[in-house]
Amino acid sequence: MQSRSTVIYIRFVLWFLLLWVLFEKSHTEEDIIITTKNGKVRGMHLPVLGGTVTAFLGIPYAQPPLGRLRFKKPQSLTKWPDIWNATKYANSCYQNTDQSFPGFLGSEMWNPNTDLSEDCLYLNVWIPTPKPKNATVMIWIYGGSFQTGTSSLHVYDGKFLARVERVIVVSMNYRVGALGFLALPGNPEAPGNVGLFDQQLALQWVQKNIAAFGGNPKSVTLFGESAGAASVSLHLLSPESHPLFTRAILQSGSSNAPWAVTSRYEARNRTLTLAKFIGCSRENDTEIIKCLRNKDPQEILRHEVFVVPYGTLLSVNFGPTVDGDFLTDMPDTLLQLGQFKKTQILVGVNKDEGTAFLVYGAPGFSKDNNSIITRKEFQEGLKIFFPGVSEFGKESILFHYMDWLDDQRAEKYREALDDVVGDYNIICPALEFTKKFSDMGNNAFFYYFEHRSSKLPWPEWMGVMHGYEIEFVFGLPLERRVNYTKAEEIFSRSIMKRWANFAKYGNPNGTQNNSTRWPVFKSNEQKYFTLNTESPKVNTKLRAQQCRFWTLFFPKVLEITGNIDEVEREWKAGFHRWNNYMMDWKNQFNDYTSKKESCAGL
């Protein structure tokens, strides 16, 4: 009797376990298979910090831009019949990779880590578990000077941000270099800015589909770094993008930076130059595009680096342009007119923005020594970063950036060139963008990132480099096996909290009052927030004197002295002619005097 009851009990337990397994399986399947407007996608569960995040990697959001679609705006997808397996990153878009320091982690970490292909328009989604309802969405746009980049880099992994802040993180690939930004403005076969239109189509995908993942399409924050931040600010300037997002975060980049946007004329000229180099010079634009579409992408990559004759270490060979569609005018003009999305922005820069560019060819600089440069090397560096600027213009930079009270320090020229490059290209444009935004009555918040990562592979003299706040924004120090310091883990958590607060509420302070308050940036006080492992501080007027030099004084110097070298050449030529006339007159006079004296003796 007892044995029979035991059998019944065992059967009951087995049935219960079977039902539980089936329930869990269906629950799990429900979590990792989601129906989008184009079809079903299967993701995967990732263990993260004692919990779980569901990741969907490599979801297509556009037709592959192959063949006749090369150089054209991205085309919407049709439906797929089966379940799309979104469990691994997709191809990276074609690009030239950084071969400057083979095997060196500091440069290799930014190179694409998946196969290169033109079939690259895919996006990734990370959602917290259990699946949320109406969660805030944060969309990441990578940088890389519009020439390189991919969403699959380890440093852009969205799982920690999704897990800790219970936000949905999205990132997308977009076309870069000539394949993304070659332009014959006005021609629909190659209108330019197709890399930006890729981003825009991904934003449309989020609006249509993110609710199925548990996201709120009315709470979407764009965030990006360097060219990614410039992209974010271009979406702020592009009316078609305005309904597709709510707020914006700009890390070390803005659309008014000198490298961010080229004129229609210059964009067209670069396309024609590439066509000439690659053997595609033709009588009309249609034939040029037809020829370029038949070229191997690797051949285009090889030649695109030669289209700027005076290339600097910050050259953007093919980037955004004024196409009359995505971008109707130069960013400075649109900012001046107040033609941008009225919303909240969070903007910031790193302490040593310039050093990352100096080691790629500035005279006397190297990652393998302290790069103590001379005055002559400083001046040669200015020639590289400011081609076409008159000698007087370059001397004005040297005069402004030299510390004349402490001009015996060995590091003075190295630090000065770091500041020149960082201020001109990153810091001052970002501050100017923020001022213009704030002046129109929008809430803006500005940060100054001061912490040098303990894991940074670059030498100590390079300081708090361009791009190295990203790992803290994405929570990489939370992964214990990587061996960041405890202070860095706490610091990273605080940054993720402030970024997520801003995304959720439009204010990095959120609803908490127990920490230092991050003030709103106003153009009269210009308060900004310092970010480091110590207690944050509120300071005012970051790089105010230097930025006045770049925004007010230097443009006047260029205007007055832009053709001074030509004037000098003309003056010298004129003086040489006059001198010849005078010498000829003197010779004639001497000859006359001599003859006169000869005649007097007769």
UniProtKB/Swiss-Prot annotation:
<dbReference type="InterPro" id="IPR050654">
    <property type="entry name" value="AChE-related_enzymes"/>
</dbReference>
<dbReference type="GO" id="GO:0005615">
    <property type="term" value="C:extracellular space"/>
</dbReference>
<feature type="glycosylation site" description="N-linked (GlcNAc...) asparagine">
    <location>
        <position position="483"/>
    </location>
</feature>
<dbReference type="GO" id="GO:0006581">
    <property type="term" value="P:acetylcholine catabolic process"/>
</dbReference>
<feature type="active site" description="Charge relay system">
    <location>
        <position position="353"/>
    </location>
</feature>
<comment type="function">
    <text>Esterase with broad substrate specificity. Contributes to the inactivation of the neurotransmitter acetylcholine. Can degrade neurotoxic organophosphate esters.</text>
</comment>
<feature type="signal peptide">
    <location>
        <begin position="1"/>
        <end position="28"/>
    </location>
</feature>
<feature type="glycosylation site" description="N-linked (GlcNAc...) asparagine">
    <location>
        <position position="134"/>
    </location>
</feature>
<feature type="glycosylation site" description="N-linked (GlcNAc...) asparagine">
    <location>
        <position position="514"/>
    </location>
</feature>
<feature type="glycosylation site" description="N-linked (GlcNAc...) asparagine">
    <location>
        <position position="513"/>
    </location>
</feature>
<keyword id="KW-0597">Phosphoprotein</keyword>
<feature type="glycosylation site" description="N-linked (GlcNAc...) asparagine">
    <location>
        <position position="85"/>
    </location>
</feature>
<keyword id="KW-0719">Serine esterase</keyword>
<dbReference type="InterPro" id="IPR029058">
    <property type="entry name" value="AB_hydrolase_fold"/>
</dbReference>
<keyword id="KW-0325">Glycoprotein</keyword>
<feature type="glycosylation site" description="N-linked (GlcNAc...) asparagine">
    <location>
        <position position="284"/>
    </location>
</feature>
<keyword id="KW-0964">Secreted</keyword>
<feature type="active site" description="Charge relay system">
    <location>
        <position position="466"/>
    </location>
</feature>
<feature type="binding site">
    <location>
        <begin position="144"/>
        <end position="145"/>
    </location>
    <ligand>
        <name>substrate</name>
    </ligand>
</feature>
<dbReference type="InterPro" id="IPR002018">
    <property type="entry name" value="CarbesteraseB"/>
</dbReference>
<dbReference type="InterPro" id="IPR019819">
    <property type="entry name" value="Carboxylesterase_B_CS"/>
</dbReference>
<dbReference type="InterPro" id="IPR014788">
    <property type="entry name" value="AChE_tetra"/>
</dbReference>
<dbReference type="InterPro" id="IPR000997">
    <property type="entry name" value="Cholinesterase"/>
</dbReference>
<dbReference type="GO" id="GO:0005886">
    <property type="term" value="C:plasma membrane"/>
</dbReference>
<dbReference type="GO" id="GO:0003990">
    <property type="term" value="F:acetylcholinesterase activity"/>
</dbReference>
<dbReference type="GO" id="GO:0004104">
    <property type="term" value="F:cholinesterase activity"/>
</dbReference>
<feature type="glycosylation site" description="N-linked (GlcNAc...) asparagine">
    <location>
        <position position="369"/>
    </location>
</feature>
<comment type="similarity">
    <text>Belongs to the type-B carboxylesterase/lipase family.</text>
</comment>
<keyword id="KW-0378">Hydrolase</keyword>
<feature type="modified residue" description="Phosphoserine">
    <location>
        <position position="226"/>
    </location>
</feature>
<dbReference type="Pfam" id="PF00135">
    <property type="entry name" value="COesterase"/>
</dbReference>
<keyword id="KW-0732">Signal</keyword>
<keyword id="KW-1015">Disulfide bond</keyword>
<feature type="active site" description="Acyl-ester intermediate">
    <location>
        <position position="226"/>
    </location>
</feature>
<feature type="glycosylation site" description="N-linked (GlcNAc...) asparagine">
    <location>
        <position position="269"/>
    </location>
</feature>
<dbReference type="GO" id="GO:0019695">
    <property type="term" value="P:choline metabolic process"/>
</dbReference>
<comment type="subunit">
    <text>Homotetramer; disulfide-linked. Dimer of dimers.</text>
</comment>
<protein>
    <recommendedName>
        <fullName>Cholinesterase</fullName>
        <ecNumber>3.1.1.8</ecNumber>
    </recommendedName>
</protein>
<feature type="glycosylation site" description="N-linked (GlcNAc...) asparagine">
    <location>
        <position position="509"/>
    </location>
</feature>
<dbReference type="Pfam" id="PF08674">
    <property type="entry name" value="AChE_tetra"/>
</dbReference>
<dbReference type="InterPro" id="IPR019826">
    <property type="entry name" value="Carboxylesterase_B_AS"/>
</dbReference>
